[in-house]
Amino acid sequence: MLRAAIAFFIIAIVAYIFGASGVAGMSVEIGRILLFVFLALAIISFVINLVSGRKP
């Protein structure tokens, strides 16, 4: 699960970079949405990993 959290975090950062670079007006909104979606998934995965107590 920790690997999934890290993967979601990296995807969130990449989505933000593409969205914030100003390629197109719509890409900014899409990048922001993807940032929050994947950041939320990363946090959820990390919390589940902490609660379950299993090692990755």
Swiss-Prot record:
One of its GO terms (cellular component) is plasma membrane. It is a multi-pass membrane protein. Its main location: membrane. Belongs to the UPF0391 family. The keyword Secreted does not apply. It comes from the Bacteria. Signal peptide: none annotated. HAMAP family: UPF0391 (MF_01361). It is found in: Cell membrane. Keywords: Cell membrane, Membrane, Transmembrane, Transmembrane helix. The chain crosses the membrane at residues 4-24, 33-53. This is UPF0391 membrane protein Bd1438. The keyword Cell inner membrane does not apply.
